[in-house]
């Protein structure tokens, strides 16, 4: 079953490019050089996140840490969370060329029984 983005995620804009859980897991398992970025507050990141995830406290820190040709995957809590959509759009607008959204986010990852890291796990 393919998850559909929240209807507001596409209002007046191009659709958001996405990645499914199985492909993301394969990339992580294979050690591919992706940049997986959690688009939630620091406290949420510290509580739980997908292993290998990055977190940035402000956009300028993020933009200076990532190269425009990095493969970047953004996620947040679940398919209805728009933080990852906003981050996706900000990266695209800044000229990052390989950005996708893991729409299912933490809820989908945890629901599949996959490993999480953090102080609430």
Briefly describe each language-model feature range.
Residues 20, 57, 103:
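Short loop/edge segments at beta-strand edges and connector loops
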Residues 113-121:
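Active-site neighborhoods of enzymes that stabilize oxyanions during catalysis
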């Amino acid at each position: 079953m393919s998850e559909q983005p929240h209807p507001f995620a596409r209002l007046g804009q191009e659709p958001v490019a996405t990645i499914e859980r199985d492909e993301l897991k394969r990339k992580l398992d294979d050690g591919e050089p992706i940049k997986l970025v959690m688009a939630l507050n620091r406290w949420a990141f510290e509580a739980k996140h997908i292993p290998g995830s990055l977190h940035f406290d402000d956009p300028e820190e993020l933009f200076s840490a990532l190269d425009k040709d990095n493969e970047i995957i953004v996620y947040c809590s679940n398919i209805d969370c728009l933080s990852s959509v906003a981050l996706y759009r900000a990266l695209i607008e800044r000229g990052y060329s390989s950005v996708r959204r893991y729409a299912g986010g933490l809820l989908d990852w945890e629901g599949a029984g996959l490993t999480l890291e953090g102080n609430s796990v």
